Design a protein with these regions (language model features):
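Conserved small/polar residues in nucleotide/adenosyl-binding loops
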Residues: 124-126
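His/Asp/Glu-enriched, well-ordered alpha-helical/loop segment
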Residues: 1-8, 15-117, 121
């Protein structure tokens, strides 16, 4: 399995498409790598004792401008992977649900909606 941050900042869309092609969608897991400033307005925040500047969906270290993490939630990553990276919606949803459950060995209980499984539902607009 490969975990991939599809926020449009960490990895170029062409590289995401290439990773899906090389690995196969059943081995891809969408993650957000979101830091504590996720959902907050632009400004300066602290992450692990380091000063971080957030502008839009970019979080960079104040000290040297290096990428400091993501300020994008998983729903936004789903939108980005479908709209900008041209991954089919059904595939993207599997990469955020059943694939992580399989990676953790809990797919019999989580990761999809079926009788006997625990239902975790989110309603999002893509």
């Amino acid at each position: 399995m490969a975990e991939i941050i599809c926020d449009g900042v960490h990895i170029h869309p062409s590289m995401v498409r290439a990773a899906f092609k090389m690995m196969g969608a059943d081995r891809m897991i969408l993650i957000s790598d979101s830091m504590r400033a996720t959902g907050m307005p632009d400004g300066q925040y602290t992450l692990g004792g380091l000063d971080v500047k957030v502008v839009g969906n970019h979080a960079t270290l104040v000290s040297d401008g290096a990428l400091a993490g993501s300020v994008t939630n998983l729903a936004d990553c789903l939108r980005t992977v479908v709209k900008k990276m041209e991954i089919p919606l059904e595939t993207a949803i599997a990469c955020a649900t059943i694939n992580p459950a399989k990676s953790l060995g809990i797919e019999d209980t989580y990761g999809s909606i079926a009788p006997g499984k625990k239902a975790n539902l989110s309603l999002i607009h893509i």
